[in-house]
Amino acid sequence: MLAGLAGALAAAAPAFAQERAGEPAADGNIVVTGRPEAPPTAREITRQARSITAQSGLRESPLPRFEDRLCPGIIGMKADYASLMIDRIRANAERLDMWLTEDDGRCTPNFIVAFVRDGQAELAALEDEKGYLFRSLPLHERRELLAEDGPVRVWTTTQTKTRDGIPVQRGQGGNPPTASMWMAHSKIYVGTREDIVSVVVLFDMADAQGKTLLQLADYATMRGLARTRPTEDGQALDSILALFDADGSPPLQMTDFDRAYLAAVYDDIPNIPGITKVQGVNRQLRLQAQAEAGAPATRE
């Protein structure tokens, strides 16, 4: 199903010609290749996972994630293309064993992908007219969102809850109370979790031109299902977060690293310190490799 869906999405937007591997050079010259690069180390993978995580205080705070049913919706795109993007986002969520609404078009979207002429102007106008919608954002996040001048803006609303799902009110300073405790398996858990209530991913239409529906859906998935950010520094592993990099060739879809990152975020219970999730990307990559090789998964 996933392979067929990926093919349909790729066919619905610009395609890129590729040379066939192994085809001899036209002039018959001998091609000399160097030694393959060594695979990235566990430390490099963890460093990359940390760099794309849009959050500080990872040793004390959990990473935000969806705990309620997910309902993706698209604004500003033709219905048939929007349907393909929604199918892809839902398929990505299914791979993470996320809780999804029925795919009948009747749910109220809590994951909105919108294509607009000027995302910064849209948000500024919305703040002027309905500023109360931004009250749940800490002041520094609100300022960063409204000042963002890149091709994509991500507006994530979260709710701090106890580990059992009871809402926790923020203090006067905007920071939720935190607590640590010992639980089973000799792991340290935190007393609260951070639930994503809703996400709006705004693409500037001019910058989205030339990208495939598959790339756009996977980029939105990577930015919306977790609080991530693109980085300008060179990375050890490819990522769909490089989709709008001015230099280089972005991947055609989510990479193994991307899937491992999201799998780590949605692995186990939600009230685990973020640093544990970040370090878990290495484990998820190993599990992926074992699955591709047909080897039985080993307990770690």
Set out the residue ranges of the language-model regions.
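N-terminal signal peptide c-region/cleavage motif recognized by signal peptidases
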Residues: A12-P14
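Bacterial N-terminal signal peptides that target proteins for export
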Residues: M1-L5
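Extracytoplasmic/secreted envelope proteins and their assembly/folding machinery
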Residues: A42, T46-A49, A82-R90
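Compositionally biased P/S/T/G-rich terminal and signal peptide-adjacent segments
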Residues: P39-F66
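Long, folded non-catalytic interaction modules
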Residues: G73-R88, D97-E300
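N-terminal secretion/transport leader regions
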Residues: D27-A38
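Acidic/histidine-rich, surface-exposed loop or edge segments in extracytoplasmic proteins
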Residues: G28-I30, P62-M77
